[in-house]
């Protein structure tokens, strides 16, 4: 028995196994992308994977990219313009309304952080001007380190904390009301509360009809 030839065959089989695994992974990734875009998956051949011009990657839809820059107010306006949209998923980009609301909420927080930073700078300048000749009476500065324990103490600004709390409550209420209206519209239009895609919608409608017929 020629062990050298056996070793070469084993190496060749390993290389083929790796190639097949890579091709299978590319095919699976491509099909996942098509399914997420609500398109019917195509039938592929192994030769398609070898196409030099093919590039497979994680790409985001333009609608999802725009959603990252929406504020809650812009989200509400967008929702009013799309009352017929799907409950579980938008028609084009595959982004759910929950994700859209989350992105809108995150942008609102970023805007609020910028506003509070500017407000903090203005308040600090005003305090320094008013208290130039006023000695500090045990007031903790912005950041203070205990030399014995090494702990850092940061003084809270009550004004900014209260402003943040009020803003978060207001934005949370707006997002809740927007989501509630959207769910009510979907229930009125389709008779089902939510669905992921067209097949799921048809299945939910069928269940709804059967449940009404059995009553």
UniProtKB/Swiss-Prot annotation:
Family from the record: Belongs to the SYF2 family.
By what name is this protein known? Pre-mRNA-splicing factor SYF2
Give the CC-aspect GO terms. cytosol; nucleus; Prp19 complex; U2-type catalytic step 1 spliceosome; U2-type catalytic step 2 spliceosome; U2-type post-mRNA release spliceosomal complex; U2-type prespliceosome
Q: Give start-end positions of Polar residues composition bias.
A: 111-123
* Pfam families for the chain: SYF2 (PF08231)
The subcellular location is: Nucleus
Q: What does the annotation say about its assembly with partners?
A: Belongs to the NTC complex (or PRP19-associated complex), composed of at least CEF1, CLF1, ISY1, NTC20, SNT309, SYF1, SYF2, and PRP19.
Which classification does the entry list for the species? Eukaryota, Fungi, Dikarya, Ascomycota, Saccharomycotina
Misc: Present with 1670 molecules/cell in log phase SD medium.
Alphabetic keyword roster = mRNA processing, mRNA splicing, Nucleus, Phosphoprotein, Spliceosome
Q: Where is the composition biased (Acidic residues)?
A: 48-57
GO BP terms: mRNA splicing, via spliceosome
Q: Which InterPro entries match?
A: mRNA_splic_SYF2
| Record function comment | Involved in pre-mRNA splicing and cell cycle control. As a component of the NTC complex (or PRP19-associated complex), associates to the spliceosome to mediate conformational rearrangement or to stabilize the structure of the spliceosome after U4 snRNA dissociation, which leads to spliceosome maturation. The cell cycle arrest of SYF2 defective cells may be due to the inefficient splicing of TUB1.
> For the region Disordered, what residue ranges are annotated?
36-97, 111-149
Q: Which residues carry this modification: Phosphoserine?
A: 45, 124-125
Q: Which domain of life is it from?
A: Eukaryota
Disulfide connectivity for this sequence is none
Q: Which residues form a coiled coil?
A: none
- In its UniProt entry, the species of origin is given as Saccharomyces cerevisiae (strain ATCC 204508 / S288c) (Baker's yeast)
């Amino acid at each position: 028995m020629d062990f050298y030839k056996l070793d070469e065959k084993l190496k060749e089989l390993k290389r083929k196994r790796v190639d097949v695994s890579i091709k299978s992974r590319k095919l699976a990734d491509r099909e996942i992308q098509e399914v997420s875009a609500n398109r019917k998956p195509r039938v592929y051949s192994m030769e398609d994977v070898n196409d030099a011009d093919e590039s497979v990657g994680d790409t985001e839809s333009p609608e999802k990219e725009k959603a990252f820059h929406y504020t809650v107010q812009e989200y509400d306006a967008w929702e009013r313009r799309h009352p017929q949209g799907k409950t579980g998923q938008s028609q084009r980009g595959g982004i759910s309304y929950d994700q859209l609301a989350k992105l809108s909420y995150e942008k609102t927080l970023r805007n609020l952080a910028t506003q509070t930073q500017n407000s903090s700078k203005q308040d600090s300048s005003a305090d320094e001007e008013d208290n130039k000749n006023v000695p500090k009476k045990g007031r903790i500065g912005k950041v203070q380190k205990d030399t014995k324990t090494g702990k850092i103490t940061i003084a809270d600004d009550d004004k900014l904390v209260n402003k943040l709390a009020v803003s978060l409550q207001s934005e949370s209420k707006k997002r809740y009301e927007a989501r509630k209206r959207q769910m009510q519209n979907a229930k009125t239009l389709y008779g089902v509360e939510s669905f992921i895609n067209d097949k799921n919608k048809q299945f939910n409608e069928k269940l709804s009809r059967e449940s009404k017929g059995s009553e």
